[in-house]
Amino acid sequence: MGILKAASSKKNLRPCVIGIDPGLANTGYGIISFSNNRFECIEYGSISTEPHLLQGERLLKIFDKVSELIEKYRPKEAGIETLYFAKNATSAMSVSEARGVVLLALAQGGVRVGEYAPNSIKKAVTGIAQAEKRQVQEAVKLILGLKEIPRPDHAADALAAAITKINLGDVGEVRAYV
């Protein structure tokens, strides 16, 4: 469990963006950089929490792991999907709580957050606001020059949020170094 590393964990020496796809069971994350008109994937994965833990313990684990990523990579910018209300109110509440602790960790780390609607992320990554999940995953793979689609799905979604932060020009320091 914990952080699943699916890409390089080398120390980042240039400005980067963290993308987060919050969820109580699995919170996806992705760290990318952008320079010389080229994206680079630094690390991605998922923070998993066990269902037998108390709600507060699960939220603390998410907070601690996101804080560790911020400490390790020192991102100045973050992209996160806005919460959309699903039919399942319990699920929406859990995602909202996870999102809250992620936003707290980002605020404590001095990370500037851009929040994007799902269709905005799809459009920024694929050019199509109504793109299917698989199209977004393929676009993330292509944009970041990865050999395969990032797994788990939450990590791919987080990388898409980070790409959106850059593609929409909603970054300060990252673009300043381009």
From Swiss-Prot:
Entry keyword DNA repair: yes
Active-site positions, per UniProt? 21, 81, 154
Query: Which top-level group of life is the source organism from?
Result: Bacteria
**Would you tell me the Gene Ontology cellular component terms?**
cytoplasm; Holliday junction resolvase complex
The subcellular localization recorded is: Cytoplasm
Q: What is its EC number?
A: 3.1.21.10
| UniProt keyword annotation of Kinase present | no
Cofactor comment: Binds 2 Mg(2+) ion per subunit.
List of residues binding Mg(2+) 2: 81
Necessary cofactors: Mg(2+)
A Pfam family the protein falls into: RuvC
Identify the keywords attached in UniProt to this record, alphabetized: Cytoplasm, DNA damage, DNA recombination, DNA repair, DNA-binding, Endonuclease, Hydrolase, Magnesium, Metal-binding, Nuclease
Q: In terms of one coarse class, where is the protein primarily found?
A: cytoplasm
Catalytic activity, as annotated: Endonucleolytic cleavage at a junction such as a reciprocal single-stranded crossover between two homologous DNA duplexes (Holliday junction)
Q: Which residues are involved in binding Mg(2+) 1?
A: 21, 154
Any Gene Ontology biological process: DNA recombination
Q: Which GO terms describe its molecular function?
A: crossover junction DNA endonuclease activity; DNA binding; magnesium ion binding
Family recorded in the similarity comment? Belongs to the RuvC family.
Q: What does this protein do?
A: The RuvA-RuvB-RuvC complex processes Holliday junction (HJ) DNA during genetic recombination and DNA repair. Endonuclease that resolves HJ intermediates. Cleaves cruciform DNA by making single-stranded nicks across the HJ at symmetrical positions within the homologous arms, yielding a 5'-phosphate and a 3'-hydroxyl group; requires a central core of homology in the junction. The consensus cleavage sequence is 5'-(A/T)TT(C/G)-3'. Cleavage occurs on the 3'-side of the TT dinucleotide at the point of strand exchange.
The protein in question is named: Crossover junction endodeoxyribonuclease RuvC
What is the organism field in this record?
Treponema denticola (strain ATCC 35405 / DSM 14222 / CIP 103919 / JCM 8153 / KCTC 15104)
